[in-house]
């Protein structure tokens, strides 16, 4: 067929379960994950799913906090952790962060980068305080970083996508 070979990770049949601090207990049937995941592309470069798991093992990561769009990756990564004899980290899949119009935020959209917001005069405390409350029912207010850290609760996080509202950050500023 003219295709270059890739390396796949054989997913054993059955349920794959893991703890998620936002979603609770998550279970996927390996048959419904779209087949055995590619772990090394035809150009020899490892995929995110594999490289992320190996990196987490090497760095002894205990918690993986990332976007909701990676929750199915976690199921395959659980099997990779197990196959490599490593502890499975605790996951927290946060709701998708959307722009003010409801579109998906892009890493390439520099206007909402932390460095760009700081350059526009936004105080770091305002940015962090807003982000700590985003996706919860908590009304954002300026607070010391230590307080935000001790009060943060993954279980208070909703699962619905949230919109980043620059006007709310401006009010905190």
Regions found by a protein language model. Give the residues of each.
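Catalytic adenosine-cofactor/nucleotide-binding cores of aminoacyl-tRNA synthetases and other
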Residues: 72, 84-173
């Amino acid at each position: 067929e003219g295709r270059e070979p890739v390396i796949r990770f054989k997913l054993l049949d059955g349920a794959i379960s893991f703890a998620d601090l936002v979603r609770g207990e998550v279970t996927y049937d390996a048959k419904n994950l779209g087949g055995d995941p590619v772990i090394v592309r035809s150009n020899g470069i490892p995929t995110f799913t594999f490289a992320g798991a190996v990196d987490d093992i090497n760095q002894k990561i205990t918690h993986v906090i990332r976007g909701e769009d990676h929750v199915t990756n976690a199921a395959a990564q659980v099997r990779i952790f197990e196959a490599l004899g490593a502890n499975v980290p605790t996951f927290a899949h946060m709701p998708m962060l959307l722009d003010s119009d409801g579109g998906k935020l892009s890493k390439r959209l520099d206007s909402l980068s932390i460095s760009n917001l700081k350059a526009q005069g936004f105080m770091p405390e305002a940015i962090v305080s807003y982000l700590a409350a985003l996706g919860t029912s908590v009304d954002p207010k300026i607070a010391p970083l230590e307080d935000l850290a001790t009060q943060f609760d993954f279980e208070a996080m909703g699962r619905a996508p949230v919109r980043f509202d620059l006007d709310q950050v401006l009010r905190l500023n």
